[in-house]
Structures are given as C-alpha cells and as structure tokens.
Curated annotation (Swiss-Prot):
Disulfide bonds: none annotated. Binds 16S rRNA, required for the assembly of 30S particles and may also be responsible for determining the conformation of the 16S rRNA at the A site. GO terms for cellular component: cytoplasm; small ribosomal subunit. Pfam families: Ribosomal_S14. Belongs to the universal ribosomal protein uS14 family. Keywords: Ribonucleoprotein, Ribosomal protein, RNA-binding, rRNA-binding. This is Small ribosomal subunit protein uS14. Signal peptide: none annotated. One of its GO terms (molecular function) is rRNA binding. The keyword RNA-binding applies.
Amino acid sequence: MAKKSMIQRELKREKLVAKYAQKRAELKAIILDINSTEEQVWEAQIKLQKLPVNSSASRVQRRCKVTGRPHAVYRKFGLCRNKLREYAMAGDVPGLKKASW
C-alpha cells in the first residue's frame, strides 16, 4: 500500500498537467513551427521552461487504483499485476480468465 502522501502528490501532478496542457501545447506548436522566427522560438522556449516542472505529462505516473502501487500497472484495468491476478482468480473482472493451452 502506497503512502497517502505519494498518492496525493500524483493527484496534484495530474491537476497541474490538466491546468497547463493548453499553454504547453501552444508553446510547443510555436517551437515546432518552421515559419516561426528565431526570436519567437526563443521566447516560447523560455516561457516553456518557466512553467512548473510537474505540469509536464511525463511526470505523471500511473498507480494502482486499489493499492497505489506505481509499477506493473495495466492501463486497461488500472490495477497492478498482483491485484489484477487476485481479482481475475475471484472472477471480479468481467471477460478475463486464466489462459490455458
């Protein structure tokens, strides 16, 4: 079980990403636009650097919805491998069954 502070930190990061997503996209569009002047690109890069570090989408880490575990989390289910196996064996995940061949 993850500490509550770690889970709250991830939630805070998700809020920051949502808040600054539009601004980040606009600045990145200016930087990648071939018609932008060097000065415009330079200013956009400076503004992008001044945004909060945690507002970058790559800083957000998927966590298990049950335990808060940060590793081995399946996107489709939002569960870590341990809980996914536990729920699948109990029949709590619809359409999922143990493979046998």
